[in-house]
A protein has these predicted regions:
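PEST-like, low-complexity acidic/proline-rich intrinsically disordered segments
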Residues: 1-9, 61-73
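N-terminal intrinsically disordered, cationic/polar leader segments
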Residues: 8, 69-290, 294-380
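Serine residues within intrinsically disordered or low-complexity segments
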Residues: 9-12, 18-21, 29-31, 63
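Short linear/disordered segments characteristic of secreted peptide precursors
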Residues: 20-22, 33, 53-54, 58
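Short, low-complexity intrinsically disordered segments enriched in A/P/G/S/L with frequent Arg
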Residues: 31, 41-42
């Protein structure tokens, strides 16, 4: 296959999406069969917590864990035990350059992880490796497929390209999981003009995980890691539980800093549903990153007040789902990275009096705030 972009064709976005979560208690409906239990609509809600047409999952992104497990499960029974296996190759580093007719170069560097679910039980039970795809072969395949991509593609497209190859080329492979982290190389600008072949290393990383089953069933998750943001005002923390262990003072004026990790799932269940636009995934990644940043900071002149990291996190997640109907769910992890006020005193005098000006940065220990937001279909 010479052009990975040829994988995709036009189709409308599926509208049905009904994830499960730790705070949406469910049970199989009375009419559900064993086969039905893989479907979200085979379950009936017992308790649902709604947040403006979304459902909020706190602490654990259970819906993604369940969906991922359903997509990539290959369990068998051995001697009265349940056995599940997979094998793959991790941290395969590959860089690719594309050149256009105007002499502009385009560059990506990826770290690729591959995991195959396959029918190779004899390798474990009797030492028969005849059904094993060697991990060195997987590594080589990454470079072969990168060479075959004549046109510039996204990390998501390359992950789909690889996963589709493994599930179609090897009869014993039932599913492939491809995880890619893209190193943040950015084009250099000299005197305001983009350099044709010059790049510098940025900060936050573009991530993706793709699961492809032999049947063609698909799951795509994209994300961002290392998005460091900070504002020096318009943040506070009040009204929290106070007990004999509490020494933290309440405040309406503090610095707020975090390193955002976000992952979002697309609703596409098959290749035919993915938009054919070549730059679709890259543009959506940049759009979502911009939305997260804008919501965190607010307007350039006024900003926006944050009463807690939790409140800001929900606003950020909700704005992504409101703006982008092609995002089914989003998970955010936002540690509260502390800048502690500095007050220094000796026995006789105060050396430094804090006036919202001198801080001691520290990231250990730090607060840990994580939640996810998913679309639901209300039956009300």
């Amino acid at each position: 296959m010479a052009d990975a972009a040829g994988l995709f064709s036009n189709s409308s976005i599926p509208v049905h999406y009904s994830p499960r979560s730790p705070i949406r208690w469910i049970r199989p409906s009375a009419s559900a069969t064993n086969d039905d239990c893989a479907r979200a609509d085979a379950y009936e809600p017992i308790i649902e917590i709604f947040v403006h047409n979304f459902i909020l999952h706190e602490i654990v992104f259970e819906s993604d864990h369940q969906a991922r497990a359903a997509m990539a499960s290959d369990k068998v029974a051995i001697g009265g035990f349940q056995f599940e296996q997979r094998h793959g190759k991790s941290r395969v580093r590959v860089a690719r350059v594309w050149r256009d007719d105007r002499g502009h170069h385009y560059f990506v560097e990826w770290s690729v992880n591959i995991s195959l679910l396959s029918d190779c039980l004899p390798a474990y039970t009797s030492g028969d490796n005849s059904d094993i795809v060697a991990t060195d072969t997987m590594k080589n395949t990454v470079y072969v497929k990168a060479k075959e991509c004549n046109d510039q593609i996204s990390a998501e497209e390359f992950a789909i390209f690889l996963a589709k190859h493994f599930t179609s080329y090897y009869k014993q492979v039932t599913a492939a999981i491809v995880n890619i982290v893209e190193k943040p190389w950015e084009r250099v600008f000299i005197d305001g003009e983009p350099h044709k072949h010059g790049f510098k290393l940025g900060s936050e990383k573009h991530t993706t995980e793709v699961i492809v089953k032999k049947s063609g069933e698909l799951q795509i998750t994209s994300g961002i890691e290392g998005l460091s943001v900070l504002k020096t005002t318009q943040s506070g923390f009040e009204g929290f539980i106070r007990d004999k262990y509490t020494v933290l003072p309440e405040t309406r004026e503090r610095m707020l800093a975090t390193e955002v990790s976000a992952s979002w799932r697309y609703p596409y269940a098959s290749l035919s549903g993915i938009p054919s636009k070549p730059s679709y995934f890259v543009e959506r990644y940049l759009d979502i990153k911009q939305s997260l940043v804008e919501t965190f900071f607010g307007s350039p002149k006024e900003g926006v007040y944050s009463p807690s990291v939790q409140s800001t996190l929900l606003h950020m997640a909700r704005n992504v789902l409101n703006r982008f109907p092609d995002v089914a769910s989003i998970k955010l992890n936002m540690p509260n990275i502390h800048f502690l006020p500095v007050n220094l005193s000796s026995k006789d005098t105060q050396i430094v009096k804090f006036n919202d000006d001198v801080y001691m940065p520290t990231d250990e220990p730090h607060g840990s705030i994580e939640a996810s937001l998913s679309r639901i279909q209300s039956k009300i």
